[in-house]
């Protein structure tokens, strides 16, 4: 959690954390903060992309799980992504301690292509 994702150095700090030796295969890095409107904003540095992406479903779910475990949110949260779109995450906890997450939001085709023979 950071004070304000809008001014966070997602590329620089994200790259540093992504390449930290603690994460042998690298890791995605999520930055989250309260928005002025009272909600939450999230930005993600993605491994493989090696930069910031407009949204990350797994990052949103992981962030919601952490916020929930820290007592920052209840079972449901909406996160405004770098694209400006909002994704919702619901965390359901069973009595035996199992957490199940569901993600909701808009999905879009952003690229189509054809691979030739390799």
Regions found by a protein language model. Name each.
Residues 1-55, 62-118:
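Active-site proximal loop and beta-alpha junction motif in alpha/beta enzyme cores
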């Amino acid at each position: 959690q950071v004070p304000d994702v809008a001014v966070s150095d997602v590329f620089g700090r994200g790259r540093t954390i992504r390449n930290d030796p603690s994460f042998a295969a690298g890791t995605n890095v999520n930055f989250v903060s309260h928005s002025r409107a009272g909600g939450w904003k999230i930005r993600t540095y993605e491994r493989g992309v090696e930069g910031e992406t407009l949204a990350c479903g797994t990052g949103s779910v992981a962030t919601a799980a952490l916020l929930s475990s820290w007592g920052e949110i209840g079972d449901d949260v909406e996160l405004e992504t770098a694209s400006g779109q909002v994704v919702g995450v619901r965390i359901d906890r069973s009595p035996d301690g199992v957490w199940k997450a569901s993600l909701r939001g808009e999905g879009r085709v952003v690229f189509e292509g054809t691979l030739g023979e390799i």
